[in-house]
Amino acid sequence: ERLPVMLYPDEPFDCHGVYSGSALVEDGMLYLYYTGNVKHPGEYDYIKQGRGHNVCLATSRDAIHLDNKRCLMYNQDYPAGLTCHVRDPKVFALDGRYYMVLGARTLDDHGEVLVFESADKLHWNHINTITTPKAFGYMWECPDLFELDGQWFLAVSPQGIACQNVYGCGYFALQGDWRTDCTLSEFHALDDGFDYYAPQSFAAADGRRIQFGWMGMPDADYTNPTVEYGWQHCLTLPRVLTQDGNGCLLQAPAAELNALRGEARQPAD
């Protein structure tokens, strides 16, 4: 069913784009956390100056009509030493509190993830920063922090690393408490293909951890045929994540995809 556009960049805090984020569902209310992009007029590089990357929140009861829309954090609310590139809030609940991870780029081009905590989903405090001892890319986009059988994982899409595909994405296994102090394992790629980026996961009602990726290739030299209809790009097929007990993720197609299968065909000799 084709539904109307729900989120428009129609406020001063998101006037140049509703950028990616995440959703939280509680008590029949949908909380949509996203990045509000603002490009201030002037002679700026829009990396270290001139850009607002705001954490915004929209709420809805039916996922069609908005009840409220507000800005929760502006550039000045982030830790010192960062560029204007802070984005992609992923929010989840744990032990009666709420947590948010944000991708960030430092002034010396070091990718990292900011961890925030909240008691009410509205007011957020920075409690930790997760990164590598040496720079691993200049920006970590679309972070996702999740736990599988007692092991925590941090998935990121780092910009500025050498990889065989166009857009690299992968994950670290975490040792320690990510709320206070932790170290990261070796980085593992999530996909060896060329069109899988910015993956995000959620916990299904039956406990499975399901992940979708972005099938986009925005800088490719081909044009998607759907552009003339006002949209482009897709989400990938859902994958169920498990772990092998040694800090590595395993991926399998979601069982629901079986219902889409048709009659099997054998290749001709």
Enumerate the predicted regions with their spans.
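Beta-rich carbohydrate-recognition and catalytic domains
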Residues: E1-D88, A93-G137, E147-D192, M215-A268
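Repeated scaffold domains used in trafficking and secretory/extracellular systems
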Residues: Y138-P143, Y197-P199
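Catalytic and ligand-binding motifs that coordinate phosphates/metal ions
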Residues: G193-Y197, F202-A203
